[in-house]
Amino acid sequence: MNILLVNDDGVTAPGILCAARYLSKEHYVVVSAPESEQSAVGHGITLRFPLWARKLDINEPFEMYAVSGTPADCVKIGLDVIYKDKGIMPDVVISGINRGENLGTDVVYSGTVSGALEGAIAGVPSIAISVADFKDPIYETGARFLLNFLKEFDVKRIPRFTALNINVPSVPYEQIKGWKLTRQSKRRYEDYFEKRIDPYGKDYYWMLGDIIEDDPDPKADYKALKEGYISVTPITIFMTNEELLKELEGIYGDGKNFR
């Protein structure tokens, strides 16, 4: 397959390099990744400023471009410039391997997940993948899983506007029990800010937080990881609350006319 590989940790991050080296054993891989770290930038794109895509001179079995933008920018450049200039299109967009998990409400902030969703908007089957350890992630486990997953899973089954969000426990591959289909959980953060003083005597604030995991759903994404499984969650860009919409339509119909 032809693969467009992006991330939010940056073009030289070990996660994307590990993924590229594994995937290029059996696939054609083009890396289009931010020239600097873009973690938690969400689905931002660059407007009213130029973008640069610089091909790197590397001794690797894949191509690598450093892009002066966000993960979503990297997907746009990868599809509309890099692959287009080759006269082909990727069969799948893969975003990762991310340093740290993207579970529950993480997906709202994640540049990694947004990279996959940008591919989904463009109509290319897309996958985001993260390893659930920020300090010492075992990327090889995620890379080996990806290579095997692409053999057994037909990416064409992923519809437009939908992506797979994959989270991998940071343990040796041999310790993984398998993978489970899961739902995006209500896992979230209770944030607070610590007031500090900079070297010039001015106040600044450092955001900290506690993880809240109280979702009763047995298919909640984070529960699969706690049980030693890889979590595979289909997510979509559409955010309409269908249940509330139906309830409000029962009260207001289509809405209310002012005139």
Curated annotation (Swiss-Prot):
It catalyses: a ribonucleoside 5'-phosphate + H2O = a ribonucleoside + phosphate. It is found in: Cytoplasm. Binds 1 divalent metal cation per subunit. Keywords: Cytoplasm, Hydrolase, Metal-binding, Nucleotide-binding. The keyword Lyase does not apply. Its EC number is 3.1.3.5. GO terms for cellular component: cytoplasm. It comes from the Bacteria. Its cofactor is a divalent metal cation. It is an enzyme of class 3 (hydrolase). One of its GO terms (molecular function) is 3'-nucleotidase activity. A divalent metal cation binds at D8, D9, S39, N98. Its main location: cytoplasm. Belongs to the SurE nucleotidase family. PANTHER family: 5'-NUCLEOTIDASE SURE, 5'_3'-NUCLEOTIDASE SURE. Nucleotidase that shows phosphatase activity on nucleoside 5'-monophosphates. This is 5'-nucleotidase SurE. The lineage of its organism: Bacteria, Thermotogati, Thermotogota, Thermotogae, Thermotogales.
